[in-house]
């Protein structure tokens, strides 16, 4: 349950059942005092087993109600359908990317290289600053809609586009950094992003929050995966 909440981008100060249940449902475990819980469970085991059964059943009810309220099972099923990952697989951004990208790469007539042995190079990634008030006045905060997927779609950031772009006339390509050039005609990710983008817009129109969230997480993962040493 904790990993499922984190995968769906829920954030809590603590992920214990008591805390999450109080935050989402307004009620908690049948034994509220965490400092006395173990002693109370031991007492119930020896002297009041029906009350102990009630305590365990209430824990189960809380978990089920949290899953229902957050649409977690729907989210996990949809994520599995989109990525091909097992229902209980958490993280797995590289595996999800591989499942979606490699078959399309093969259809384009290319084979991805194997991972180099002992690769340890890392990329710094992006840095998100916290919004702490009081340092500056008149600060404008801009929230770009699906920023990373938009960059991929607009500038054709894509391994196949890079391979073709380096072989095509420079004037017919989209310039990148460190001498990189991306093909305007031959690419995979921009089309995949566009398909997922439209699917997410439809999900939002239909108020299908689990599907919308699953697609959003998948699209955002594409950007970081390409800088990962674990990605072919």
Residue spans for each PLM region:
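Common nucleic-acid-contacting/processivity interface regions adjacent to the catalytic cores
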Residues: 42-153, 211-232
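Helical catalytic core of nucleic-acid polymerases
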Residues: 133, 137-138, 144-232
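Short coil/loop linkers at secondary-structure junctions
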Residues: 26-28, 111, 158
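Residue-level "edge-of-site" marker
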Residues: 34-35, 118, 165
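Exposed alpha-helical structural elements
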Residues: 16, 20, 37-40, 51, ...
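A generic structural-conservation signal
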Residues: 29-31, 76, 114, 161
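Active-site-proximal helix-loop-helix substrate-binding element of RNase H-like nuclease domains
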Residues: 1-60
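Hydrophobic residues within well-ordered, non-membrane alpha-helices that form the packing/core
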Residues: 21, 25, 67, 203-204, ...
């Amino acid at each position: 349950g904790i990993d499922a909440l984190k995968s769906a981008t829920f954030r809590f100060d603590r992920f214990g059942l008591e805390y999450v249940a109080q935050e989402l449902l307004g009620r908690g475990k049948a034994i509220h005092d965490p400092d006395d819980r173990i002693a109370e469970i031991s007492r119930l085991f020896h002297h009041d087993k029906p009350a102990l059964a009630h305590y365990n059943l209430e824990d189960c009810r809380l978990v089920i109600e949290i899953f229902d309220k957050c649409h977690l099972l729907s989210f996990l099923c949809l994520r599995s359908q989109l990525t091909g990952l097992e229902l209980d697989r958490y993280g797995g951004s590289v595996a999800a990317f591989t499942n979606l990208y490699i078959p399309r790469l093969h259809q384009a007539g290319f084979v991805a290289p194997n991972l180099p042995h002992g690769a340890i190079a890392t990329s710094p990634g992006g840095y998100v600053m916290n919004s702490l008030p009081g340092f500056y006045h008149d600060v404008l905060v801009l929230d770009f809609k699906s920023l990373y997927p938009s960059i991929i779609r607009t500038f054709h950031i894509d391994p196949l586009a890079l391979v073709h772009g380096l072989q095509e006339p420079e004037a017919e390509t989209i310039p990148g950094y460190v001498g990189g050039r991306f093909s305007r005609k031959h690419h995979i990710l921009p089309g995949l992003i566009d398909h997922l983008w439209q699917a997410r817009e439809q999900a939002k129109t239909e108020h299908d929050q689990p599907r919308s969230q699953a697609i959003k997480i998948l699209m955002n993962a594409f950007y970081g995966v390409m800088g990962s040493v674990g990605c072919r």
